[in-house]
Amino acid sequence: MIKQKLNVISRFKLAHFSGTLTYRNCQLANIKMKHYKNIFVGIFFVLLFVIATLATWVYSQIDSALPQLEGKKTLFGLSATATVERDEAGIVTIKAKNRLDVAVATGFVHAQERFFQMDLLRRNSAGELASLFGEAAIDYDSDIRRHRFRERATTIVKQLPKADSDILKAYTRGVNQGLKYLKAPPFEYLLLQHEPVEWQEEDTILSVLSMYIDLQYQDGKRERTLGLLQSTLSAEVYDFLNPKGSRWDAAIDGSQYPASPLPKAPWPSASSEELTTLMQGNTVQTALNTLIPDILSREKSPQSEEFPGSNNWAVGGNISATGSAIVANDMHLGIRVPNTWFRASFEYQSKHQKPVKITGATLPGTPNIIIGSNGHIAWGFTNSYGDWSDVIVLETNADNSQYLTPEGYQPFLKRKQMIAVKGQEAVDITVTDTIWGPVIGKNAQGDLLAYRWVAHDTTAVNMAITELETATNVEQAFAIAARAGMPAQNLMVGDNQGNIGWTIMGPIPQRSKAFGEVPTSWANGEHQWQGLLPAADYPKVMNPDDSRLWTANSRVIGDDMLAKVGNGGYALGARSLQIKQNLNAKNSFDEQALLDIALDDKAKFLLRWQEFLLSKVLTTEMLAKNSDWQEVKTIISTDDLAATKDSVAYRLVRNFRLNVRDQVFDIFNENMTKLDEDFSFHAIRHQLEIPLWQLVNQQPENFLWRGHDSWTALFEETLEKTLAEMTEKSSLANATWGKQNISKIQHPLSRAVPLIGRWLDMPEVELAGDSYMPRVQGKSFGASERMVVSPGHEERGIFHMPTSQSGHPWSPYYGVGHESWVNGEASSFLPGPVAYTLTLLSY
């Protein structure tokens, strides 16, 4: 009994001890949990504090990168006080004592608003993008470095006339002070973790050289492509694919050239032995499987119809509402955020102490008004597409160490180049030069090729365009154009006396004889450049009888004048012809009438393709075979074919044409690419409309590729493909042109970091317009501005452009004006009421 009690007591004590131990363990666990919780809470708040601090710092840095809009700043280089006025859209009016002070103030404003854009321009032509973006840009930089543009820019700066040099120095002072006075570097450098580098005088030259790269071939691509065709195809097939003229030509001198006739021989027998050998022993499909990737994928989409250029036109005072000339201009470029141009007005005293007031568009990186009006003249540009370069076939010795010149064999000049690369060691490359220019590669026969290009000359860039600001008539503008250093453009100019004129503005090479379409040897001295064309010999047209002038990147003149300019790859003349027809449709014009021409989206070019579909494809037999196609016929049976946002018919006819083109030429394109990877279908695609139309109408069976039984089968397959593409995401009735042509206007950094796109990019909207009509408009390509102005009547003028003045997303006018551009509204050419005033004081 006693023993049992002791056992009970023992078990009780043990249980009590165990309970106490468990309780204490629980207490310890709770203490530990509270301790860990406190640690976690502490860490959370520390992280929150760090994130908040970092966010505050980032916010502060971005906010501090905004330009100063009001107040006072003291600038070195000003001779007197200057003011910078901005309206609500950020359009700048600079008022200063003289042109040099305007240059200082312009540099200051450009740096504060657009320095990152300026930086990209100079790095683009210098081949220095890899130091900003890393290894992704090494290949591009290596390609560009062969031009040695930074060295050339430095040389140009040293030999500029004093007046040009003074403006360049003043602008550079303004840029660096504008950058310095930002409280933080432009926000892009924060994202790139890079410090901006100060502006140098040669950087302005590099900015213009970047426009050469944009507007001319930096690699001779088109000439090399034509050279391959000429060496590979029979003469009649080559002429067929490279016609001199077409029904679309609308030259201002009325000159016309016929298209080449359809060759008698089909593709295979018309081709050289080399091309025939390519296909021997292979079925078509085997050949396709072994071909290298299509060059198109490395250039543009095969169906890209973008054509860097522009429209401009003018009417004389005798048919204008103002009595002065009226000039219209829209320059077609790739569009991104911010826009290429920066709007400004300058007010100052000329060197003759006369008041100057000029309004227009500037290019950040340069101190000039590029297009605009000064009360006496108004002017605009389109890309000329003359022949401003030559590819030279080098005759080398056995080991390719020397090349033949008129003076005998000479050694190649090798130059080392170092490419700085962000985040890794620099890359060393070697560029090879000749007396004519850099070596750019080899042709299909293995010959080395050199490149002679006006952009390599010391005359390529100068500040002569500044003189347009004080020109008072068309003749003075012509004289300035002939000595200007810039990518050669079609200058359209009108004055307040009602005169209008066209000429080339920029350097024109003077060749020893007619040549330049295809690569040629210069070894015997027969082919050479003999300096630049004298000013007196520049082609020009002034005051035509009908008081109307127009250009749109196609051939402008013929005969002797054309021989001076050459053909560097003209656009098909459809846009030019439509502008001409619109000008001839009226007897008098005001500014709105000319803007209406700029906004014309009628698809006159595609009318014959519309009729072709209706009469040759959607036949009774074809409709019986494909009953669903009755809807197609109903849709495209419209009397008003236009690239409007709601048009299904336009999208269908347009895409059918492009798919037919690609079906007809695809094997040909692939064969040429196999022979030479530098072959560029993209460079010749516009001229192929002429032979394409002959082929689809004459339908020679021996010109069919890819195993089609007949042309009818090709058209049927192409229409099926077109409809399948259009109905992939919607019914055919809802597959409008606007659904395909949706804007994609982005900041360069948002492409790399999509998350910031909503913050930086313009809204995606459906757009009217397309190629082959005045209203040129693609997803991220089109009219970089539209201007209509009559000199002396600027208050009636019209100007709008995509994106906005600002490059900073927190700017009060970021995106302001973009909607006017989308809708084609007649917004004012002149700045509006002053909203912000900044006073710049001199030391």
Protein language model annotation of sequence segments:
Residues 32-49:
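N-terminal Sec-pathway targeting helices
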Residues 42, 55-326, 331, 337, ...:
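Substrate-recognition/specificity elements adjacent to catalytic centers across diverse enzyme folds
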Residues 102-105, 152-165, 462-468, 563-569, ...:
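Second-shell loop/turn segments in exported
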Residues 348-361, 368, 372-377, 381-523:
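Glycine- and hydrophobic-rich flexible loops that cap the catalytic core of alpha/beta enzyme folds
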Residues 564-622, 715-843:
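Terminal end segments
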Residues 656-734:
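Charged, long alpha-helical assembly modules
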